């Protein structure tokens, strides 16, 4: 781990703040007339996803850290444990959801045999990178009455992972759809 001056910190840098890994979301540098330089940072904790703000003076330093990404294939979920296979070493990686509460919101998007990037810090997986839009198959749709369409009417659909989202009335069982992984909302239907 390297020590960096506050003036060298850039957007996208990884820092160790109060013992936890953070990514710099925003950086604002201002130089006051008498007081010297100030760097205001907006940071996202990579373990619990909380966003904090820090202000550093010009002479302050921070600890830069290395974050690694490992390509892994999702194998299965066994109760509260996600099991992946590291594609480089072919070792199995088990992630206990009780110990990694921030990974809970990723579970509905994980599909068996798909490849994901596991973000690691200090040899511990702290995040699973998802694509912005993910393809799913519709396995169940809620019945909708066609006459109730004053505006764009939506209905609940259940996807192959169990995730339930709202989608337009024209979506049927067996259709493939793209879902926004950030908002958990329907994005579009995939044409065959």
UniProtKB/Swiss-Prot annotation:
Where's it found, cell-wise? Cytoplasm
Coiled coil stretches, renumbered: none
Q: Which Pfam families match?
A: EFP, EFP_N, Elong-fact-P_C
- Alphabetized UniProt keyword annotations: Cytoplasm, Elongation factor, Protein biosynthesis
Q: What is its main location?
A: cytoplasm
Keyword Lipoprotein attached: no
Q: Pathway, according to UniProt?
A: Protein biosynthesis; polypeptide chain elongation
The residues the entry assigns to the signal sequence are none
**What terms describe the molecular function in GO for this protein?**
translation elongation factor activity
Q: Name one GO biological process term.
A: peptide biosynthetic process
Spell out the GO cellular component terms annotated for this protein, sorted alphabetically and separated by semicolons. Answer: cytoplasm
HAMAP family, A to Z: EF_P
General function of this protein: Involved in peptide bond synthesis. Stimulates efficient translation and peptide-bond synthesis on native or reconstituted 70S ribosomes in vitro. Probably functions indirectly by altering the affinity of the ribosome for aminoacyl-tRNA, thus increasing their reactivity as acceptors for peptidyl transferase.
Q: What is this protein called?
A: Elongation factor P
Q: Which organism is the protein's source?
A: Borreliella burgdorferi (strain ATCC 35210 / DSM 4680 / CIP 102532 / B31)
The coding gene here is efp
């Amino acid at each position: 781990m390297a020590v960096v001056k506050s003036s060298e910190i850039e957007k996208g840098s990884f820092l160790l703040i109060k013992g936890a890994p953070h990514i710099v979301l925003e950086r604002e540098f201002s130089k006051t007339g008498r007081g010297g330089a100030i760097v205001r940072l907006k940071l996202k904790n990579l373990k619990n996803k909380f966003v904090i703000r820090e202000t550093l003076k010009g002479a302050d330093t921070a600890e830069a850290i290395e974050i690694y990404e490992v390509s892994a294939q999702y194998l299965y979920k066994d109760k509260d444990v996600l099991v992946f296979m590291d594609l480089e070493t072919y070792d199995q990686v088990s992630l206990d959801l009780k110990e990694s509460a921030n990974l809970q919101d990723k579970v509905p998007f994980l599909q068996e045999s798909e490849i994901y990037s596991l973000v690691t810090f200090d040899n511990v997986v702290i995040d699973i990178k998802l694509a912005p839009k993910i393809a799913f198959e519709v396995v169940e749709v809620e019945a909708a009455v066609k006459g109730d369409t004053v505006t764009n009417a939506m209905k609940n659909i259940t996807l192959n992972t169990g995730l339930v989202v709202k989608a337009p009335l024209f979506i049927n069982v067996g259709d493939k759809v793209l879902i926004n992984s950030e908002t958990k909302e329907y994005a579009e239907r995939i044409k065959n």
